């Protein structure tokens, strides 16, 4: 017809997609039209693939037009050159799912991500080079990063918006301005590699705390600078900090905190819905682009949690007091946020997927199977290593979990000799100590640095050392695990260690069921508050004739102390009710079955609720309500999460 211009239709067809910054009007342009994102963070590594679609759809129905996710390098390259991108690690499938639901993606591929994730996503094997300076232009570090980006980024390229995919912007590094190295050559290297793999038209950006000193080392010409801050901060001031770095262009809060992180032994954090609503409305009214961190927090399954310094590990739950709970449930915060978005944008009509039903399967009796020591031949299939002085986890190529250190007492030690890692605080992170199978007590990094023990010359001294999660933020992310210094006993330095890296996962998956009955020869009573680390197993059946089962549930540990739990071989993470605030662990239904009994395996490291010698059973309980905010009696360390919160503009106590 008249005025028909074939070239015009072609360029605006599905083939020609652009996403760019309009500097003259301080906004984004998507396919030439003004655009603003309202986004939420969800980490695919913290939500089972089974639930990705459910969580993403709930985010879409809240009115979000984008999601933001991190790519944890260590989740995908557990050993050098060994890559995992299938099942729960299938990041491409996750991003395609978001695309299918009409959600855009803000991708944060690191290589460092912080995220309260083990070592901020950096693989522990980087530490095999002892002098390595992480997050800098150290050639050893850059070589590993370069190889990784060469694997990851080509997978991301077809998913870029320009190429018909959902990814509109890509973050380079993560809050680099908060790190001591301040190495612009490193940022330049990343910029070059990102451009090489993703092309020149992709929008690259950085994120830093909204203080000028953070943007000094965190920004680079050619990377669009954004800020992050929470509910207590002064929004005008925060965006002025961004304006100093980027006088023109869209205002962006890349991490607007809907809640905050927890540590074992500290109170559970919450942020009031009213505070979230008022800051969110204010930012949206200014035309700002906002990503809510987190919109859906999820779970640190297995050993993936991080830690902060002075050393304090984060718990298994990463609920974050976010609008969607750890189990993906709708909260009042969800509906309040949706209402705010409705004032500014069109929110999808239709039915919001409901919270998933939970089922209380009740008490499950477990019997004690074997102590760790009694199961060494199964747990340590790779064999042990001998060394004059202790080796770290990395030196025996064990990245997660547990290593047993054994030596013999060089002489008789009567009435309480001091076993100690002083002055080095060298137990990273907890050691469960026994002599000839008699439990002695626990050493704990930064908390319990010595222990009185006694024993005869030639007796076995065993320290089972647990890696409780690597530091993920700040200067001390090169966090070695195991015995990282010598141990002294009285005035002797202990030598001639045999070191057993334990393959707990393999043992639990393949052998536990077949282990012969309980071995009670190690039944010497130790101090009443501490018994030998041991495995307990039991099972429960879910009747197949009840429709809709299995359903999600939560496991709690009445009377238990601290340990690790698996259901049907799936590592649910750490429990520590003795410390709190988390008392229950989330159990997603896809790991349960109705066709056979469900196996529960517990590795209790300190003390189970039944005698170590008697035949009586211990029980765990499957309940339908989570408890992640129990009161805490433990004395917290001086201000870790509060200090961090303050740095992120979360200073207004009314927000908590």
Task: Tell me what each language-model feature is.
Residues 8-12, 16-50, 57-61, 82, ...:
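Extended substrate-binding grooves/exosites of carbohydrate-active enzymes
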Residues 36, 63-65, 99-105, 161-168, ...:
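Short, well-ordered coil/turn segments that N-cap beta-strands
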Residues 43-61, 80-99, 273, 414-422, ...:
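Aromatic- and glycine-enriched glycan-recognition loops and surfaces
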Residues 51-118, 191-199:
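Aromatic-lined substrate-binding rim segments of carbohydrate-active enzymes
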Residues 71-80, 88, 101-134, 139, ...:
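Aromatic-lined carbohydrate-binding surfaces of glycoside hydrolases
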Residues 142-156, 163-172, 177-179, 183-187, ...:
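Carbohydrate-binding surfaces of carbohydrate-active enzymes
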Residues 164-244, 248:
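Gly/Pro-rich turn-and-neighbor structural signature
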Residues 415-435, 540-568, 575-576, 600-603:
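Aromatic-lined ligand-binding clefts that engage carbohydrates, nucleic acids, or primary amines
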